[in-house]
Design a protein with these regions (language model features):
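H-loop/switch region of ABC-family ATPase nucleotide-binding domains
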Residues: 104-105
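Conserved catalytic motifs of ABC-family nucleotide-binding domains
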Residues: 64
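Conserved beta-strand-loop-alpha-helix hinge in the C-terminal portion
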Residues: 124-150
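Helical segment within the ABC ATPase nucleotide-binding domain
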Residues: 83-96
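ABC-family P-loop ATPase nucleotide-binding domains
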Residues: 1-46, 52-55
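Catalytic Walker B motif of ABC-type/P-loop ATPase nucleotide-binding domains
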Residues: 68-71
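ABC ATPase C-loop
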Residues: 60-61
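Helix N-cap at the start of a conserved alpha-helix in ABC-type nucleotide-binding domains
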Residues: 79-81
């Protein structure tokens, strides 16, 4: 976390983390609500997938990025942990007023999160929707739009099962 926090700053040969910084990191980790504040000396590889994703999200936002890129950041998580990570994502994006680009195959998440939805197929944008029209979309509507725009039926079970 200290490296992420100091991103873009000059580094010297001083002590790694001052106690003031350690307290700051402890407070940030406590806000995540995943018990990470008690595992500050644990190796990241020993954390659960959800804990790692939340920690990565926190580290990515320590220095306000111009663009927060989230590429399938909940794909390997169980539904409860995925919801927690998505809630943390929303909170951080809104609180820090970040611009975020979230790539997902979960159509429900694509509809519910963000202010714009862009659907792609074979590297091409086939559907772009925002505002009230996006808010009124359903997964079934999105599947129909995909079939119309791509000229074929939807063939990925993973996306269908995420309803």
């Amino acid at each position: 976390m200290a490296l992420a926090f100091r991103r873009g700053h000059r580094r010297g040969l001083g002590w790694g983390i001052r106690s003031q910084e350690k307290d700051y990191y402890h407070d940030l980790l406590t806000r995540l609500g995943l018990g990470l504040q008690n595992r500050m000396t644990s190796k990241v590889g020993l954390l659960s997938g959800g804990q790692r994703q939340a920690l990565t999200l926190l580290m990515a936002t320590l220095q306000k990025p111009k663009l927060l890129l989230l590429d399938e950041h909940t794909a390997a998580l169980d539904p409860q942990t995925a919801k927690k990570v998505l809630d943390l994502t929303r909170e951080m994006v809104e609180e820090q007023k970040l611009t975020a680009l979230m790539v997902t195959h979960n159509m429900r998440d694509a509809i519910q999160i963000g202010n714009r939805l862009i659907m792609m197929n074979d590297g091409q944008i086939i559907y772009d929707v925002a505002g009230e029209e996006k808010q009124n979309l359903t997964v079934e509507d999105l599947l129909e739009k995909f079939a119309q725009a791509s000229g074929g039926a939807f063939a990925n079970d993973r996306m269908l099962l995420s309803k």
